[in-house]
């Protein structure tokens, strides 16, 4: 949510079509995550599947929503939405940065920072017991895939807008 607010603010301030494109994709990724949770909940239910683990949030999950109220969230755990969004934003941003003619040192530094931030967010979801490792990994993998897709479609879409 914070990423969406920052990108929205940047778009309002600059009217940059690339910011609007990223904002739209962040909303798409958020909605896809909610759709995937519904589909996976229908398939998994309360079952635990080898390697994939369980789809429900851990029993210890509390304070995982926007408001820390000490209650277990009612949303399904698979895939982790935080991991999904963090991986998407990190991968997409790294690909965009690497496509610009700036020094390799800056590209590498930004890639390290973005990757570390995404991994920190994913790690925090397991430390706070909001998700299992499998739920976080699935969110990260899906977010990364959508980041690559969004980057590869960027020039096609932006050319049609301009």
List each language-model region with its residue ranges.
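Short regulatory "switch" loops immediately downstream of catalytic or recognition motifs
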Residues: 8, 40-45, 94-100
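Hydrophobic membrane-targeting signal helices
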Residues: 12-13, 28-35, 98, 122-123, ...
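Membrane-embedded catalytic cores of phosphoryl/pyrophosphoryl-handling enzymes
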Residues: 55-162
């Amino acid at each position: 949510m914070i990423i969406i607010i920052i990108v929205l603010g940047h778009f309002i301030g600059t009217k940059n079509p690339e910011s609007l494109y990223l904002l739209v994709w962040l909303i798409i990724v958020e909605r896809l995550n909610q759709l995937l949770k519904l589909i996976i909940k229908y398939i998994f239910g309360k079952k635990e599947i080898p390697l994939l683990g369980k789809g429900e949030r851990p029993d210890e999950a509390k304070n995982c929503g926007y408001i820390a109220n000490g209650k277990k969230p009612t949303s399904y755990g698979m895939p982790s939405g935080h991991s999904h969004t963090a991986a998407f934003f990190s991968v997409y941003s790294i690909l965009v940065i690497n496509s610009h003619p700036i020094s390799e040192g800056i590209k590498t530094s930004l890639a390290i920072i973005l990757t570390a931030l995404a991994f920190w967010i994913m790690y925090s979801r397991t430390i706070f017991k909001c998700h299992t490792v499998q739920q976080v990994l699935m969110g990260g993998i899906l977010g990364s895939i959508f980041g690559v897709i969004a980057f590869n479609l960027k020039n096609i879409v932006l050319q049609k807008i301009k």
